[in-house]
Amino acid sequence: MSWQAYVDDHLMCDIEGHEGHRLTAAAIVGHDGSVWAQSATFPQFKPEEMNGIMTDFNEPGHLAPTGLHLGGTKYMVIQGEAGAVIRGKKGSGGITIKKTGQALVCGIYEEPVTPGQCNMVVERLGDYLLEQGL
């Protein structure tokens, strides 16, 4: 399966039991910041934004004072899982980033999608990739 198929079929799909509810944008990005696959709506990000995210995975709490920035959008960092998941909130939407062995699985959402639904979609694919050694 191509990386694009993972984004299209597993991240940008309808959320279980909620037809028509789906993430606003999603991507799979290598630890080096290279985009493996992304939705057409995923924001173009700066290398320093990805560096900040990777630093937060290695040093949890790094982004808390300044916020998580992606594609010029600032998210307030909320409770995640140290070294594994970073979550951010902005207004009625937010972002979930799950770290795997080689990649970051990113999902961005707006209402009516809930934070929990975004977490479920992103973390399920991230956990699957971890099981596959990726």
Curated annotation (Swiss-Prot):
It comes from Olea europaea. The modification Phosphothreonine is found at T114. The keyword Disulfide bond applies. One of its GO terms (cellular component) is cell cortex. Phosphorylated by MAP kinases. One of its GO terms (molecular function) is actin monomer binding. Binds to actin and affects the structure of the cytoskeleton. At high concentrations, profilin prevents the polymerization of actin, whereas it enhances it at low concentrations. Disulfide bonds join C13-C118. Keywords: Actin-binding, Allergen, Cytoplasm, Cytoskeleton, Disulfide bond, Phosphoprotein. The keyword Disulfide bond applies. It is found in: Cytoplasm, Cytoskeleton. It comes from the Eukaryota. InterPro entries: PFN (IPR048278), PFN_euk (IPR005455), PFN_sf (IPR036140), Profilin_CS (IPR027310). Occurs in many kinds of cells as a complex with monomeric actin in a 1:1 ratio. The variability of the residues taking part of IgE-binding epitopes might be responsible of the difference in cross-reactivity among olive pollen cultivars, and between distantly related pollen species, leading to a variable range of allergy reactions among atopic patients. A motif (Involved in PIP2 interaction) lies at residues 84-100. Belongs to the profilin family. This is Profilin-3.
